[in-house]
């Protein structure tokens, strides 16, 4: 039985390794700008969703403030780069500042609400996130309000930067790919994401991860054994917040633009929820699968829907169903069905199916 | 035929099996005492009968009716009342409202009300007070009163003497004796003196299994058995 | 100091909080006429928020179900009422007060009926399968909220909708130099009537007794022979209908509504329920009035802080009383 469970889990790991390999070679495999955009977004969202899974999957508490922490990191880096100019000092300072604000907020929210009731926590994080959103649009002299801010990142990441030059002074190519700053930026995103993700995998594999699982299985029992449940939950909440914040900084450096839509809006929160549920809660690897599927769907399926709707304009009902404006509606429906029928998500169900077979 | 029959009952809470094999016949009439150490499964047995936890596999039957899978409310309507360990008092409601809720149609039968006031005079005294303001003993009285405001066949009582003053325990024993004339009581008790004074039949539950069952008189006379099952020094 | 606190407790305890807030605001604002206007606005707003929040609080108290989709009922109520008022624009503009009242009555009735039906559907399809699983409950109700908001968007479109007010409720009454908007008085009174009716039901009827008992100890009510799940459906429907009514009244108050209304109100409703304490309608009323007053006073005194004021209020109260001002006895 255990052996077969392992086989299912191994299959999931294999898929995740494959995804990692595809992301590692993405610039060479898919040589267009849009694909690179997608690959970078996938990297960042894997970290973001995994850090959310740390919270929801390993402690069973639901936070709606995860985008807020992501936003702190993004705005931290963005504001520093805007105010101080495109230097590494700005990157470092902004990232740290964002992470620090996230940490402080997480501690405050955690201490205030985690000791009362898990359900309070969900409500309070929602309230906090909405205030953060309002503040971002009101403090427009710093945040650019609804328009957001654009800025320059360190020279290394400029598209015009030549990493390797040929003898005649042009950018060298490797397998047809220009070795320019854009490539450096992508690998910066990839490497940062990999480091953060591996850190989280190690964390859930450590004794702390075991304790978290014990708390998740039976809170009262864990408390009785002597684990300080509130302390552990607050700790995980803080770790998850800081990692989300770092992911936000990385994304801000990649995009060279930060605004409510890319870093703070509630729709990102919904995306995260969808990804973690689709992938499978409490598995870490599920985050990878969920993020890949959702980002691909956002970039390609939505367009496909639009094209299909136009093509089928004369067929009754279908254009309505395929209308890209209805995208969120269908996502919501799928989300509900998933939570009902596949609460373990893809990663969890795969491991299960192999066991049953 | 026995009033209540538990047949190879197993109950799990989450992933932990609390009851492994509880088989028990509770005869009609008198007080049946369920003894056992802390955590042996006494409370779980009562809650499983009441349908608050679902035993599976195994079955519970009451006068030949299979209770397994029935809703708690429907089990209660068969004439089974429950006095839980925490007494289950509605603190925000008055004493009167607590009792009104326990009646079948929302109005009191004069005789049973008079009986309750005679058994527990404090309840009449605090009739319109919020139940949270009662003392522990008075809350226990209210909880028992709720169980007997309507005629019942069987009352499940979980550790009624826990934390009560001796004088109140005496009053409680008196009340139980009177109630048990017409109603069968299934009593979970840690206080062996109290149990011995009241019980007719008894069983000891140990680690989720019935370890001994018989008459209270025999058990009370057998000090060795008591020592081995309850670790009582006396 | 202790003596002072006991005295306060005797004359009403935390119930005096709105009074204290109003008093402090009076001195900060300094202009009596502005203060009266703001206070009336705050009370009216509080009453409408109370309607929206009361169902959420009761449903949570009774079944430990926190419905994140609750604000969908508010939105639907607002849009349904707006549509009905739009169709009956002729009646609204008529000189006859009877026609005016008939129009607004029909609009509110439509919202309530919609709330009842939607509540029944929501409970059966969305909530029932996940009664005892908080995590999935939160996720599923959030999913339902997304779907509901998209439905509103699909039916009513994304552009703001004008909500006409009946003739007899437009304009203001002048009391000396104080102008009081008629609609605010109307909203306050209607809210008050609903509150009193709720209060009466809960304290004087058998079903109310069952609800109060169920909020405290669900298992015990079942052990006494009552099916809480059936009671819960009724409470859920009632709560949804009240939320829809609140939304309908809010639509008339704002006179211009957008599909974002639900999301905005959701935060406020949550804050109210947290402040007031879950499971008691007295607590919910107290929280709603506090939020209404503070929002209006701060909006006047320091407009920049207005949006954050609710949040600050919530934090302050949670630090003081982690379970809210008046939680149900548990």
Show the residue positions of the predicted features.
Chain B
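The feature captures the beta-strand-to-loop junction immediately N-terminal to the Walker
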Residues: 35-37
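Helix-to-loop junction immediately C-terminal to a conserved catalytic motif
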Residues: 50
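Conserved ABC transporter NBD signature motif
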Residues: 58-66, 78, 111-113, 118
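Conserved ABC ATPase signature
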Residues: 130-134
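ABC ATPase C-loop
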Residues: 147-148
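Helical segment within the ABC ATPase nucleotide-binding domain
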Residues: 169-182
């Amino acid at each position: 039985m255990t052996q077969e469970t392992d086989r299912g889990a191994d299959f999931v790991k294999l898929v995740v390794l494959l995804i990692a390999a595809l992301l590692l070679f993405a610039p060479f495999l898919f040589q267009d700008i849009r694909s690179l955009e997608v690959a970078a977004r996938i990297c960042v969202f894997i970290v973001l969703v995994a850090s959310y899974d740390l919270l929801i999957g390993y402690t069973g508490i639901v936070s709606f403030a995860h985008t807020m922490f992501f936003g702190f990191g993004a705005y931290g880096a963005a504001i520093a780069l805007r105010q101080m100019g495109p230097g590494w000092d700005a990157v470092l300072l902004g990232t740290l500042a964002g992470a620090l604000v996230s940490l402080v907020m997480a501690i405050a929210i955690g201490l205030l609400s985690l000791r009362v009731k898990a359900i309070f926590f969900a409500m309070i994080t929602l309230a906090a996130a909405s205030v953060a959103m309002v503040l971002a649009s009101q403090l427009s002299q710093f945040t650019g309000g609804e328009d957001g801010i654009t800025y320059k990142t360190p020279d290394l990441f400029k598209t015009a930067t030549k990493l390797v030059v040929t003898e005649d002074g042009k950018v060298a190519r490797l397998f047809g790919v220009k070795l320019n700053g854009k490539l450096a930026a992508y690998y910066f995103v990839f490497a940062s994401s990999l480091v953060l993700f591996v850190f989280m995998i190690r964390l859930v594999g450590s004794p702390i991860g075991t304790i978290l699982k014990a708390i998740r299985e039976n809170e009262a029992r864990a408390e009785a054994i002597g684990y300080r449940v509130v302390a552990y939950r607050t700790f995980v909440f803080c770790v998850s917040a800081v990692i989300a914040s770092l992911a936000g900084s990385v994304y801000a450096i990649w995009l060279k633009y930060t605004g409510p839509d890319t870093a703070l809006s509630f729709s990102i929160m919904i995306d995260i929820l969808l990804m973690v549920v689709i992938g499978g809660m409490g598995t870490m690897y599920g985050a990878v699968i969920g993020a890949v599927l959702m980002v691909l769907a956002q970039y390609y399926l939505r367009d496909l829907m639009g094209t299909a709707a136009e093509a089928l304009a004369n067929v009754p009902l279908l254009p309505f169903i395929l209308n890209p404006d209805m995208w969120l509606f269908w996502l919501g429906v799928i989300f509900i069905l998933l939570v009902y029928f596949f609460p373990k998500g893809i990663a969890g169900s795969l491991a299960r199916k192999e066991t049953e077979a | 035929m026995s009033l209540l029959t538990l047949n190879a009952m197993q109950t799990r809470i989450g992933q932990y099996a609390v009851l492994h094999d509880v088989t028990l016949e509770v005869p009609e009439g008198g007080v049946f005492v369920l003894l056992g150490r802390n955590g042996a499964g006494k409370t779980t047995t009562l809650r499983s009968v009441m349908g608050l936890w679902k035993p599976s596999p195994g079955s519970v039957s009451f006068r030949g009716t299979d209770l397994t899978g029935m809703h708690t409310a429907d089990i209660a309507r068969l004439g089974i009342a429950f006095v839980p360990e925490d007494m289950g008092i509605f603190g925000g409601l008055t004493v009167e409202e607590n009792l009104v809720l326990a009646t079948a149609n929302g109005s009191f039968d004069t005789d049973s009300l008079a009986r309750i006031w005679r058994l527990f005079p404090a309840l009449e005294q605090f009739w319109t007070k919020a139940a949270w303001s009662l003392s522990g003993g008075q809350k226990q009285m209210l909880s028992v009163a709720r169980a007997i405001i309507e005629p019942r066949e069987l009352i499940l009582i979980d550790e009624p003497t826990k934390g009560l003053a001796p004088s109140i325990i005496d009053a409680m024993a008196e009340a139980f004796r009177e109630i048990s004339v017409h109603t069968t009581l299934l009593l979970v008790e840690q206080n062996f003196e109290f149990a011995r004074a009241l019980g007719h039949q008894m069983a000891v539950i140990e680690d989720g299994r019935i370890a001994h069952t018989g008459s209270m008189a025999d058990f009370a006379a057998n000090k060795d058995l008591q020592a081995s099952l309850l670790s009582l020094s006396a | 100091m202790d003596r002072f606190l006991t005295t306060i407790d005797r004359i009403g305890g935390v119930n005096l909080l709105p009074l204290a807030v109003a008093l402090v605001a009076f001195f900060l604002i300094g202009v009596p006429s502005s203060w009266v206007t703001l206070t009336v606005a705050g009370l009216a707003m509080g009453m409408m928020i109370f309607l929206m929040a009361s169902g959420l609080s009761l449903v949570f108290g009774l079944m430990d179900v926190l419905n994140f989709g609750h604000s969908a009922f508010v939105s639907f109520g607002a849009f349904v009422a707006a549509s009905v008022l739009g169709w009956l624009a002729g009646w609204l503009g008529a000189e006859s007060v009877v026609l005016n009242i008939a129009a607004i009555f029909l609009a509110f009735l439509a919202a309530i009926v919609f709330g009842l039906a939607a509540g029944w559907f929501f409970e059966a399809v969305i909530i029932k399968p996940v009664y005892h699983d908080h995590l999935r409950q939160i996720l599923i109700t959030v999913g339902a909220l997304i779907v509901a908001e998209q439905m509103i968007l699909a039916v009513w479109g994304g552009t703001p909708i004008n909500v006409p007010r009946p003739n007899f409720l437009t304009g203001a009454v002048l009391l000396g130099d104080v102008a009081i908007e008629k609609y605010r008085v109307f909203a306050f009174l209607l809210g008050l009537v609903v509150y009193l009716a709720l209060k009466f039901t809960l304290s004087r009827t058998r079903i109310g007794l069952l609800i109060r008992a169920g909020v405290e100890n669900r298992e015990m009510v079942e052990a006494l022979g009552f099916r809480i799940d059936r009671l819960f459906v009724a409470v859920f429907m009632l709560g949804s209908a009240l939320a829809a009514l609140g939304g309908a009244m809010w639509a008339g108050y704002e006179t211009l509504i957008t599909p974002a209304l639900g999301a905005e109100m959701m935060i406020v409703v949550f804050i109210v329920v947290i402040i007031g304490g879950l499971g008691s309608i007295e607590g919910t009323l107290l929280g709603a009035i506090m939020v209404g007053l503070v929002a209006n006073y701060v909006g006047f005194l320091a407009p920049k802080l207005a949006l954050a004021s609710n949040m600050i209020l919530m934090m302050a109260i949670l630090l003081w009383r982690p379970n809210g001002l008046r939680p149900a006895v548990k």
